[in-house]
């Protein structure tokens, strides 16, 4: 396997998490997503709930407030500390074993490695809304709000910590539209690229 590590960034509702999990199962490699949260919490001393809410997403306040609030004398915030712990864990996991890592800016964190396939999964809005309503058992209006809010926070976090644009094709090896290709085809394409 030329590419040992697969990172999957994704739009909310695109099925990126599901696709990544299926790829890991089919390849027989480790899968890291929310299971990283416990490690981050343990090493940072913060609660898993706090990590769940803040490790991949920017706080619910605006990007300006995110950039300047709650920083110590060195200029570091709690979010910066969490990001640094998360970064170190991702680097350790990449050294340890072949794996699929979902989100958490892993594509950027591992950008200097030659054995990484960076994938961005996106989808058509109607299909994403339909998937969110089904998975989370919410009305369409709530699904739209969830989709917009979560992607906005993912983008703010990614753009802030990487100085790159979230979802921009140049930042990834492969960009796949799960609505157009379907999950099975996305999985096959990813596996063909490693």
Write out the residue ranges for each language-model feature.
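Glycine-rich phosphate-binding P-loop
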Residues: 8-21
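Conserved phosphate-donor/acceptor-positioning beta-strand/loop module used by diverse small-molecule
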Residues: 112-134, 140-150
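Short, amphipathic alpha-helical "lid/cap" segments that border enzyme active or binding sites
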Residues: 87, 183-191
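Small-molecule kinase domains that catalyze NTP-dependent phosphoryl transfer to phosphate-bearing small molecules
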Residues: 59-66, 139-184
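RNA pseudouridine synthases
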Residues: 93, 109-112
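Short beta-strand-centered segment that lines the nucleotide-binding/catalytic pocket of NTP-utilizing
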Residues: 30-41
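Pre-Walker A (Motif I) flank of P-loop NTPase domains
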Residues: 2-11, 97
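ATP-dependent small-molecule kinase phosphotransfer cores
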Residues: 41-98
């Amino acid at each position: 396997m030329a590419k040992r590590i697969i990172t999957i960034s994704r739009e909310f509702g695109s099925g990126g998490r599901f696709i990544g999990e299926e790829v890991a199962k089919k390849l027989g490699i480790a899968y890291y997503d929310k299971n990283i949260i416990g490690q981050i919490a343990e090493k940072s001393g913060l609660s898993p709930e706090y990590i769940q809410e803040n490790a991949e997403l920017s706080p619910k306040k605006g990007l300006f407030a995110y950039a300047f609030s709650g920083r110590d004398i060195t200029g570091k915030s709690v979010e910066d500390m969490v990001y640094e712990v998360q970064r170190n864990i991702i680097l350790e996991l990449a050294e340890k074993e072949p794996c699929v890592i979902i989100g958490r800016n892993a594509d950027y964190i591992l950008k200097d490695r030659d054995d990484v396939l960076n994938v961005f999964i996106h989808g058509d809005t109607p299909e994403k809304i339909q998937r969110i309503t089904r998975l989370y058992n919410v009305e369409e209006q709530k699904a739209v709000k969830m989709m917009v809010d979560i992607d906005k926070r993912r983008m703010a976090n990614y753009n802030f910590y990487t100085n790159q644009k979230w979802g921009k094709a140049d930042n990834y090896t492969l960009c796949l539209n799960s609505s157009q290709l379907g999950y099975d085809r996305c999985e096959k394409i990813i596996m063909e690229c490693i």
